[in-house]
Amino acid sequence: MQINEGIHLAYCTNIHRGEGWRETFDGLKNYTLKVRDNVSEGKPFAIGLRLGNSAAIELSEDGSGKIEEFIKWLDENNCYVFTINGFPYGQFHGARVKEQVYRPDWTSNKRLEYTKLLFDILSKILPSGISGSVSTLPGSFKEFISNEEEQGAQIIDNLGVCGDYVKQLRESTGKDMHLGLEPEPLGWFENTIETINFFGRFRSVHGDKYNSIIGVNYDTCHLAIEYENANESLLLLKENDIRISKLHLSSALKLKPDEAAVNYLKKFEEDVYLHQVIARYKNGELVRFRDLPDAIQKFNSNQMVDAVEWRVHFHIPLHSSPSEAFSDTNDHIREALEVLSLAPTLCAHLEMETYTWEVLPKSMQTNDVVDQLSHEYKWTLDELQSVGLISS
């Protein structure tokens, strides 16, 4: 939905299953329209569309009429798409994803072709007068990079090819479309300084011709896990002329690692998603763990006595307090929205992203996924109003 003259808000449909186009479309019909009815008050309803590679290929198949059918459906149901989540290429629910969410990475032509296809689709379904974004992974996963020079060069080359492709689409359609690279714990670049350094390297090859085309998808969960301050991070990115393509509004688990909290945290261990942990020690040192079981094992071996805080990459509902043992990182979301309220042209795209519905502990689930999403909208709209981005 359009929340003011230039800013749009959606929820990301990666919360629903949808590997092929038919399953994806069914999710929009069965869930998204119900959320629309609960929150939109008759206004045009924005969709943050997740399209995996299989779904994108099916939707765009020549002669199938599927994309025309989808455009008609959007119009008939007072909906529109302004952003596509292009991070997960393959299966994202019901099976082990973990680090495989980074495959193929930007060293691969498969990732390039998939992302180009998403922009093809976006160029056709994006309404005139609205900018469009695609979000993607931060190049690769750190442990996949065995040759920094060679693989880094390949990532930068492929992103340049993608930038050229988007530039041509922008010129042929007259639509402002852009790619947002999404820093994430243990991604090839994961925090603000690493992101700035990446763009420095990228621009040393390509110059500044992609500045408006390739930017950052700033995920408030991810940067909070890195113990960053949203005000400082966003202003640093702006000072370095890095476009904020999209703001992901998402929240992480935060806890003081005592025995009771860590025991309760075991409820969040599951086999689908990667739950990176960053522990902060008394001396300010940050120590990273690949997944939640790694951090718990370290704690149980009495090797973390000086750790004063853990932040866990587990997206939790924005409106729901996780438990008495834990806190959340909603303060980072509030900081980001306060920055946006002072500089509304900083970013036009807001997207709530809590894809973990199926693996949440039962105590954190509401009646159903539609109910959860409706509550998240209410929380977010209240926060937007509190900082003046929505008039009362």
Where are these regions (language model features)?
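Acidic/histidine-rich catalytic cores of soluble enzymes
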Residues: 166-296, 307, 316
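N-terminal pre-domain/capping segments
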Residues: 1-129, 133, 164, 210-213, ...
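Active-site acidic/histidine proton-transfer and metal-coordination neighborhood
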Residues: 95-215, 225
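Active-site beta-loop-alpha junctions enriched in small/polar residues
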Residues: 14-16, 50-54, 86-89, 137-141, ...
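Aromatic/hydrophobic pocket-lining residues that form the small-molecule binding cavity
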Residues: 24, 28, 67, 115, ...
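Anion (oxyanion) recognition and catalysis
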Residues: 75-78, 238, 314, 341
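Flexible, acidic glycine-rich loops studded with aromatic residues
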Residues: 287-392
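Short, acidic/polar
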Residues: 21-36, 66-70, 225-237, 330-339
